[in-house]
């Protein structure tokens, strides 16, 4: 019985140590959520306006630009999967991977070969273990992304996308870049502290919606200087980098929210486990004391009987 009691007390100490870790992780995640959420809210207007501006310019100029034109017989689609560098975030990464697998299946059904790019050590580990060919990866900043990180990623993807304009073969071009016909990004959209959703978006070619002409609404007239094509060439890298940066900010906020929720659940479970183990230990100790008392009483009775004889 004593060994069992020692075992229970050891398990209580272990659960207490785990609770300290999960509680600390919960507090860290909580402190980061507010800042991450503020960055998301600050980036959304710029992301929305640059997309709207390019849409209006495309409508006004009727430009035949690679950013706008759906290519004939697209063969390769670049997919950027945004994950985390660390674990302990519940189903955060699993949901992203599940959504990316759905996108891969859809692209293959359309006759397109997915070309994989990843952000975060978890995605690199996940796809490397499954023998996926990861074209390029970036890591070390999933919780605190900066625009410079998005620029670096965007430049890589834009080069591959523009290389796909004149790429008619299945091999890489002279510069060693495998051309892409589409660009997609899979990330976790931050909706609230309690709601995050893994989604996939196409960022190139842009989806331009031409609205029906309404004579009652004023229309913006554009005079392009330099040319509209030159303007789009200049804005394309910035547009892609902006969309990537906005997605990484959403993912960072979602990661912190998911980690906070997971660590709170783990802390609550540790509390429940400690209560259960403490109750078991008290019962075991009570049983041990009862047995010791019984042995003492039995011994005393035996001595009394011996004395009477």
UniProtKB/Swiss-Prot annotation:
Question: Is Repeat there in the keyword field?
Answer: no
- Keywords, A to Z? ATP synthesis, Cell membrane, CF(1), Hydrogen ion transport, Ion transport, Membrane, Transport
Cellular component, GO, one term: plasma membrane
Which GO BP terms, alphabetically? proton motive force-driven plasma membrane ATP synthesis
Q: Which PROSITE patterns match?
A: ATPASE_GAMMA (PS00153)
Q: Which NCBIfam families match?
A: ATPsyn_F1gamma, PRK05621.1-2
Return the HAMAP family for the record: ATP_synth_gamma_bact
What is this protein's name? Answer: ATP synthase gamma chain
Q: Give the taxonomic lineage as stored in the record.
A: Bacteria, Bacillati, Actinomycetota, Actinomycetes, Mycobacteriales
């Amino acid at each position: 019985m004593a060994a069992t009691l020692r075992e229970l007390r050891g398990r209580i100490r272990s659960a207490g140590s785990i609770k300290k870790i999960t509680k600390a992780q919960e507090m860290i995640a909580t402190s980061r959520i507010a800042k991450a959420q503020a960055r998301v809210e600050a980036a959304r207007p710029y992301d929305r306006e640059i997309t709207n501006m390019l849409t209006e310019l495309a409508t006004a100029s009727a430009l035949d630009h690679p950013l706008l034109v759906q290519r004939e017989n697209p063969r390769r689609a670049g997919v950027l999967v945004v994950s985390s560098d660390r674990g302990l975030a519940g189903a955060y990464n699993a949901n992203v991977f599940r959504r990316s697998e759905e996108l891969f299946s859809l692209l293959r059904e359309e006759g397109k070969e997915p070309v994989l790019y990843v952000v975060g050590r978890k995605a690199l580990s996940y796809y490397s273990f499954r023998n996926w060919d990861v074209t390029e990866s970036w890591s070390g900043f999933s919780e605190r992304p900066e625009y410079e990180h998005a620029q670096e990623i965007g430049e890589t993807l834009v080069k591959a996308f523009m290389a796909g304009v004149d790429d008619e073969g299945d091999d890489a071009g002279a510069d060693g870049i495998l051309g892409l016909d589409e660009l997609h990004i899979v990330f976790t959209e931050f909706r609230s502290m309690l709601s995050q959703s893994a989604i996939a978006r196409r960022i190139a070619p842009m989806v331009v919606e031409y609205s029906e002409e309404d004579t009652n609404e004023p229309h913006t007239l554009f005079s392009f200087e330099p040319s509209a094509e030159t303007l789009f060439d200049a804005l394309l890298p910035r547009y892609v980098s902006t969309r990537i940066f906005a997605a990484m900010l959403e993912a960072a906020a979602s990661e912190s929210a998911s980690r906070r929720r997971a660590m709170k659940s783990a802390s609550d479970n540790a509390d429940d486990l400690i209560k259960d183990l403490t109750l078991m230990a008290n019962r075991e100790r009570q049983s041990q004391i009862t047995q010791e008392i019984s042995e003492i009483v039995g011994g005393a009775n035996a001595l009394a009987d011996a004395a009477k004889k």
